[in-house]
Amino acid sequence: MKEPGGLSLAMIVKNEEMFLADCLRSVKDVVDEMVIVDTGSTDATIEIARSFGARVIEIEWPHDFSKARNIGLDAVSMPWVLVMDADEELVADDADKLRQAVFHPTADAYNIRIVSVMERAEDISESYVTRVMRAHPALRFRGAIHEQLFNAIVDAGMSLGQLDVRLTHKGYLGSVMQQRNKQERNRILLEEEVTKHPDDFYMLWQLAQTYFGTARYDDAIKISQRALKLSSPNSPLWVLAMTTYARSLLQAGQPKKARRVLQEGQLAHPKYTDFWYLEGVVLFQMKAWGQAEASFRRCLDIGEAQGYLATDTGIGGFKSLYRIAQCEIMQGEGKNALAYLLITIKQQPQYRSAWRAIFEILIGSTMGEVLNTIELSVGLDQIINTLSTWPQLDDNEQHLLECAKEKVQEQNLAGV
C-alpha cells in the first residue's frame, strides 16, 4: 500500500557525473524512492545513481524530453512525484516544506522556485516551474523540449498551487552550457517543435529565448511577434514573452520600440518589476539619465515581482540601487552615487561591479580611506570573506583585502 505522503524522485539523465551526486545527496532524506531514466550515459552516471539506491531504467534517447520523462513517471510507486534535473539541488532549508506539501496537500500539483545561478554570484534568476505533482496517469509531460505539465493539469481538471520550495540550478553556468552545447541542441529541437506546432505559444517563446541567447536578435524579434499574436496579457507567459521581445529589440538597436513594448507591458502589469527595470536600461542606453533613474526608483518602490513565473532576482533591490548610482554618476553626482553603491554592497556583498564603481569614485584616496568608507556599510569580516571568494582579484581588490586583513590584525593586537 502506498504511503499517503510518499514521494518519488523522477529524473532523466545522460553523462551527469559532474552534478548527480550533489543532486541526489540533497534529496536522499526527503524522497522515498529514486527513479532515474538514463538515456545512454558513458561516464559514471549510472554507478553514482545506484550508489544512492536509485532504480535506473536504461533507454535509447527518444529525441523527445517528454517521452523520456514520462517513462520515469510511469515507473514511480509513490503517490507524489518530485521531478528534478541532475544539475539541480534542493535547498536544505526547504525540505520540510516539501514534505508538508505532499503529506497535507492543498493542490494536485505545485510550482516551485528554480533559482538559476550564473558565473557571477549576483547574476541570479528565478522562475516557477511545475515539479511536484500527484502520480496520476493524466499528469504527463508534453513537448519534445522545454517539456511542461500545465496543459495536462488543466485538461485533467486538477488544481495547481505554488510552493516556496527552491531548487538551485547550475546548468546555465557558461562553462556547463559550452560543454553540453546546450543552446544548439535546444535550437534544433525547438525549431522542429515549432514546425510541427506553429501556433504553440509556449514553444514559440522558448525558441525566441534561444535565438536571443545566441545573439540572433532579428529572429528573436520575429518569433516573439508571432508568439504574442497568439496570447493576451491575461496569460501567465505573456509578460515573459514581452520581456524577451523588448530585450531583443534593444539588442537589435531599436531602443525606442523596445520602450514602447515595455510601456504596453507596464499598463497591463504595473507590478511586474522587470518591465520598469528594462525601461531603465533602455533609457540609460538612450542617455536619458534622469528618466532612467526614475524607472529604477520605481523598481525599488515595487520591490521584487511577486506572483509571476519568472523574474530577474535583485531588480527590486540591489540591482536597481546600482543602476541609480550609475545614473547619478552620469549626472555628475558622485557623492550621491557613492551612497547608493554602499547600500548596494550592503544588500548584496557579492555584487562585484558595485565594488569596482566605488574604487572609481574614490580614485585618488588612500586604500585606508577606501576601507574606512566601505566599512560604513560592510563590516571588516564581510569585506574579507567577500573578497576572498573572488577569483583573480584586480590590484584594487587585492590591496583592499590586504588592508582589511592588516586592520583586523592590528585590532587583535590592540585587544579590540
Question: Where are the model-predicted features located?
Answer:
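Short, well-formed alpha-helical segments that are part of the catalytic scaffolds
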Residues: 10-33
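Acidic helix N-cap motif at the loop->helix transition within catalytic regions
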Residues: 18-21, 43-52, 93
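A conserved acidic beta->alpha catalytic loop
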Residues: 26, 38-50, 61, 85
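Conserved donor nucleotide-binding strand/loop of the catalytic core
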Residues: 46-71, 75
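Catalytic-site signature of metal-activated, phosphate-bearing donor transferases
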Residues: 67-73, 84, 90-222
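Short aromatic/hydrophobic "clamp" motif used to bind/position activated sugar donors
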Residues: 81
